[in-house]
Amino acid sequence: MNHFPYTNSDIEPGDFVINPSNRNWGIGQIQSLIGNKVTVNFENKGKLVINTEKIILEKVKN
């Protein structure tokens, strides 16, 4: 899998991401995106709301 930084216009619900600062959270699937708030359901951490002004997620591509 390849990982790369994104802009909010590059992601949408259903996309898969990782938090490079907390890789142990595993891969997360975006549930919703409103402004700079992204709700992500991570496989090892559960559902979290991420502020994309503070944390840059990396989109996962197969």
Language-model region placement:
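Mixed-charge, Lys/Arg-rich low-complexity intrinsically disordered regions
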Residues: 1-16, 24
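Intrinsically disordered, low-complexity, charged/polar segments
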Residues: 1-3, 47-62
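SH3/SH3-like beta-barrel fold
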Residues: 38-42
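Short beta-strand-centered aromatic/proline hotspots
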Residues: 26-33
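Residue-level signal for tight coil/turn positions that link beta-strands
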Residues: 34-35, 52
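Glycine-centered tight beta-turn/hairpin loop motif at sheet-sheet or coil-to-beta transitions
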Residues: 23, 43-45
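Intrinsically disordered, charged low-complexity linkers and terminal tails
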Residues: 16, 37, 58-62
